[in-house]
Amino acid sequence: MAAVGSGGYARNDAGEKLPSVMAGVPARRGQSSPPPAPPICLRRRTRLSTASEETVQNRVSLEKVLGITAQNSSGLTCDPGTGHVAYLAGCVVVILDPKENKQQHIFNTARKSLSALAFSPDGKYIVTGENGHRPAVRIWDVEEKNQVAEMLGHKYGVACVAFSPNMKHIVSMGYQHDMVLNVWDWKKDIVVASNKVSCRVIALSFSEDSSYFVTVGNRHVRFWFLEVSTETKVTSTVPLVGRSGILGELHNNIFCGVACGRGRMAGSTFCVSYSGLLCQFNEKRVLEKWINLKVSLSSCLCVSQELIFCGCTDGIVRIFQAHSLHYLANLPKPHYLGVDVAQGLEPSFLFHRKAEAVYPDTVALTFDPIHQWLSCVYKDHSIYIWDVKDINRVGKVWSELFHSSYVWNVEVYPEFEDQRACLPSGSFLTCSSDNTIRFWNLDSSPDSHWQKNIFSNTLLKVVYVENDIQHLQDMSHFPDRGSENGTPMDVKAGVRVMQVSPDGQHLASGDRSGNLRIHELHFMDELVKVEAHDAEVLCLEYSKPETGLTLLASASRDRLIHVLNVEKNYNLEQTLDDHSSSITAIKFAGNRDIQMISCGADKSIYFRSAQQGSDGLHFVRTHHVAEKTTLYDMDIDITQKYVAVACQDRNVRVYNTVNGKQKKCYKGSQGDEGSLLKVHVDPSGTFLATSCSDKSISVIDFYSGECIAKMFGHSEIITSMKFTYDCHHLITVSGDSCVFIWHLGPEITNCMKQHLLEIDHRQQQQHTNDKKRSGHPRQDTYVSTPSEIHSLSPGEQTEDDLEEECEPEEMLKTPSKDSLDPDPRCLLTNGKLPLWAKRLLGDDDVADGLAFHAKRSYQPHGRWAERAGQEPLKTILDAQDLDCYFTPMKPESLENSILDSLEPQSLASLLSESESPQEAGRGHPSFLPQQKESSEASELILYSLEAEVTVTGTDSQYCRKEVEAGPGDQQGDSYLRVSSDSPKDQSPPEDSGESEADLECSFAAIHSPAPPPDPAPRFATSLPHFPGCAGPTEDELSLPEGPSVPSSSLPQTPEQEKFLRHHFETLTESPCRALGDVEASEAEDHFFNPRLSISTQFLSSLQKASRFTHTFPPRATQCLVKSPEVKLMDRGGSQPRAGTGYASPDRTHVLAAGKAEETLEAWRPPPPCLTSLASCVPASSVLPTDRNLPTPTSAPTPGLAQGVHAPSTCSYMEATASSRARISRSISLGDSEGPIVATLAQPLRRPSSVGELASLGQELQAITTATTPSLDSEGQEPALRSWGNHEARANLRLTLSSACDGLLQPPVDTQPGVTVPAVSFPAPSPVEESALRLHGSAFRPSLPAPESPGLPAHPSNPQLPEARPGIPGGTASLLEPTSGALGLLQGSPARWSEPWVPVEALPPSPLELSRVGNILHRLQTTFQEALDLYRVLVSSGQVDTGQQQARTELVSTFLWIHSQLEAECLVGTSVAPAQALPSPGPPSPPTLYPLASPDLQALLEHYSELLVQAVRRKARGH
């Protein structure tokens, strides 16, 4: 054991600072002095002096053991002189005095689990055997509790040991692989005789005269004679002489127990077999008698001078006469499995028999000849001591019921002064793999509410989860069913974790299957059961009552965190998936404001703050710490200010909960092996206890890191630890099924109590100061507004300054700022480029970059602190800015006559409303299960085609606000502002900070003619200003879009980035998002996953959406773009709909080709780079919430979107925030060669369905036809996005670099005098539509406008020739037009077109736009009426002849309209006239254009046919 290092335990005076982090751990750069100590109010004046190692080991003593690990009679023995019973419990020998109910303990200093023990005949010594490699046979002094002798002679474990009656010899038998049988002269520590036994030996027994001993096992009964072996006067080891018993026809039996006769039966030997046979051998080793016990299985045997006791299954112990083998009686059975011990208040309760009850098997027996007591150990790890003086009146002397399998968690019941307590003071709870939760209390004083039961003096109550008793019996007892060394078998069942609510009324527990249960503690009834996770629940945590909220967070091995609201009957509030691996601990912190901290096996710690929105509470990530080691557990001190984390490298790291900074790092284990598994801070915050995988426990000073005490005794890893609230005990539980209660020394207890008094005194002073300052108004709430969730910047007052001021209240509040600075979009690891890297780059004199402006948002420092992406697309949610920059100058006729009367009547929205009437109020289909919540700031491209605006903010939260028509925006239009970076040849100087205003105008070049290159290019710093609109605010012009970055933190040049790529392999990129809340799933989901847990629905929400998308036909919406900004419009009210936004999985850079030129008349559809993405939004990609998002603009005006919600579509296997911190990509700064470069970086995936392959083929037809040889810019290969559907395993990889670049070229209207008509595509079928919606990169054709009689035909309808090189431009509009938008397009000259369309100038049409709008409005209304009529006819149960005829006519009309549309869209393609069909069916997907490869075309056509057939079969099945 490592000695305690120098340095002393006593602290210095109040002026002492916390020492810097230990050697080997780099201190944070920029710190000129070590971090200060915690406030003086948290210092402990009572000090413990430096102590020796012996004192350290003796400061904590083992008071009580609740558990037993005896597997057979070899693990149970009795002192023949005193009647004390000794049994095994891990690495401890428990010596029990049944009369006094007191325990003594002998510790195995080797820390190996004990396998066998036996008392010496005089009761002064105990011999033990061990498990493991090179086990020892040890002799212990019972009185002194120390080791007398140690004998090494085995290799693989000791199965059984015994003293000879004359105490000269000790016999030890090894396990089967050891095969060694040794006879020891234990006083001389030598082996007298030895031999090898090839079969497995289970038990042995000495004869009364010590002349021989008998071993039994598999087909084995052998007599070993000591006198013949030891008569030879040879000092060396001699062979042990043995003779086999003559078994006769019983030679194939497995014998599990043996006992040599006593008294007049001294010459006989009794054996029992597993098959239930009791055998008697005479002095000549001949089988003399045998009887059938009439049981299915027997396991153990014990004899006295007069009686024989045989332990059998089902709690049976049969009693026979020793001299005649006559059956006398049975012992009373113990409790039945599943008994409610709390009801056993009367002794007669034990003898009540329950019909069809199952009783535990008997596994070990020992007899006390002094008191005539028989001790029995049962298979469920219970112990009974029976008084058998009169076998006709057997009485119970003592009993105890222990856990029979892994004990996973322990919780101490909180203390209450009033009558609210459901349990007596000092109670604690344990849970185990035996599927029970047990309530214990060590207080011997009687309690009126909890009377002591007859089964146990310490066990108050047992909760059998779901009344499951199949795991109560330990399956590792019998050698033919379990492990030989007696290690408990992990059956992957039972309760894994639990937590008591702060009010003491509820108990939350999570099992190993992922279920979450809530029990109320008055009557132990199960209130709630939630199928929460897909894997075992690893941690549960209730929020602190000081926060004003009652939340329950559950985290699991499935890497998800579910936050439940207790006050709302445990409804789900949020699901977080920041972690990329198992979550090992989760804690709530904060007194007035609430924080959530979690750590996991992905080496990440996430600090989150709560934000209250209109739709509930949401946690937003504020800090992310990425360590280099796995984090196994953590705990928070009483001040809620520090969190201690147990790390795999055996260190305890202490972090500040406010800013996430590491404050301390010290050793958590005194050994040199293993990992820290658990950490727990005592109730006073003075000490912390740690457990290591070497099975040791340490008590450490929380502030100095000095080891105060260290203990051992468990034979398996310690799974949980808790200090009691009275500061007297530490309770530990382990995988060895034992619960250890450790008594803390008086010096430790006094320190803890003194510290609590100091804290209480400080709180009283603070309360007095608060009353004095009560005149000052102060907002007191448990959460802060979204705009106040900010990290402290280096220029602001730090937490260390707050410590020096000793203001705990202000210190524990979430820091807030008056300004509306945006949060950093990506939270990266700390530190900067190392010095050696700077020297190689020649940046030795680079400024440290710490002198930021105090108003800048927090920027992490470090060599990985690179912005994951460039400036993202961003929204303006301020009314003045919206009116100023985006409100179009509408013609009076259009504004007055048409637009005011238009209503949003798209087909998809109508169908979605009719399909989900219960969701009509919220405006999204019922099958959309869960909105993806994320607690991070990310960069997204979002396109809103309807009333709901979906974008991302930089405030680390996604929100949604319904768009309402305001005074200046009567159409309820949705707006989007686009920010972008400049291309390589127009990038600003490196030292110039890019403001938001600088980046806004750069996007105009996509829509305006490209001017000649500027010799000194810079972005325009002024925004367009229209008459009647307020100009841009000063905040808007000065606010940076992202955090200001020091020049030494980011690669500023291509050379720097190449250097980073070379030395660091990858660069940090933006983290991914999370899915959202779940709703009840439908019956169809049982086909995919019968167990529909919250996590399952969370991860499969996009799969469900993709399965149902084909039932919703495409919408007809069109967006208009006004240069230089992007305006997304929706003609309609404020009711939000799903399927209107798309969240880019990674990031998108849109680089401007030139400066903006304002033209008020330059209205045109958006460029293909936007419409292609906006058109392919899946129906489930937008799920509305009601949260508010702060914006970096002034106060928003009601009626406009104040917040947006941007759920993304992450699959289960995609990178999370923590994984992206280590596996990342970067966009090379020197790879852009064209005037326009767009990078759509998406993770690799497989196609999610066969229909997706079909849609991909149609996309490729349009894309490959549009590519031109002149596009030579280097584009990245786009990767296909995964929606979590694993049905299709095909891997289709296509290189579309030139196509993607071509899509972002300026439209052809950049060439003066060139205008071409827009090209339309045929409407996709519902099957095709569903396939198209699956793609994040799909290019969906637009729906054409139906030809109406009032609309004159176009003069010409040219054919579509092949692609012509050299024609710049983009692809056709890929958005589905609304009626108003079509009227605008057809009433004004088209300004852009496809690159392959011949260049022809077309005269404008004289048609009035208002007339077009009226026609389209009537068309929509009529079609809707026809559709409603058809739906009624189809849904009616009884169909007469008239209804059938009407149905047929409607179908025929619909098909005729469809064929006419196809004939008009597919120019030059002959379409057969529609034929009436008896029932509607989905039309076959039209072929757009021939593919370049015939093989690929055939493959895609084949997959398309398969998909159509599958959909039809599914439709017929429903």
Swiss-Prot record:
Subcellular location: Nucleus; Cytoplasm, Cytoskeleton, Spindle pole; Cytoplasm, Cytoskeleton, Microtubule organizing center, Centrosome; Cytoplasm, Cytoskeleton, Microtubule organizing center, Centrosome, Centriole
Residue spans of biased composition, Polar residues class: 781-790, 971-981, 1045-1054
Positions of region (Disordered): 762-824, 908-935, 962-1055, 1339-1377
Tissue specificity field: Present in fetal brain, enriched within the ventricular and subventricular zone (at protein level). In the embryonic brain it is expressed in mitotic neural precursor cells.
Residue ranges with Acidic residues bias: 797-809
An example Gene Ontology biological process: positive regulation of neuron migration
Positions of post-translational Phosphoserine modification: S33, S49, S52, S501, S944, S1070, S1093, S1101, S1123, S1144, S1228, S1248, S1249
Positions of modified residues (Phosphothreonine): T46, T50, T1053, T1268
Alphabetic keyword roster: Acetylation, Cytoplasm, Cytoskeleton, Disease variant, Intellectual disability, Neurogenesis, Nucleus, Phosphoprotein, Primary microcephaly, Repeat, WD repeat
Keyword Magnesium: no
Disease field: Microcephaly 2, primary, autosomal recessive, with or without cortical malformations: A disease characterized by microcephaly, moderate to severe intellectual disability, and various type of cortical malformations in most patients. Microcephaly is defined as a head circumference more than 3 standard deviations below the age-related mean. Cortical malformations include pachygyria with cortical thickening, microgyria, lissencephaly, hypoplasia of the corpus callosum, schizencephaly. All affected individuals have delayed psychomotor development. Some patients have seizures.
Task of the protein: Required for cerebral cortical development. Plays a role in neuronal proliferation and migration. Plays a role in mother-centriole-dependent centriole duplication; the function also seems to involve CEP152, CDK5RAP2 and CEP63 through a stepwise assembled complex at the centrosome that recruits CDK2 required for centriole duplication.
Subunit structure: Can form homodimers (via C-terminus). Interacts (via C-terminus) with MAPKBP1 (via C-terminus). Interacts with CDK5RAP2, CEP152, CEP63 and KIAA0753. CEP63, CDK5RAP2, CEP152, WDR62 are proposed to form a stepwise assembled complex at the centrosome forming a ring near parental centrioles.
Protein name listed in UniProt: WD repeat-containing protein 62
Species, as recorded: Homo sapiens (Human)
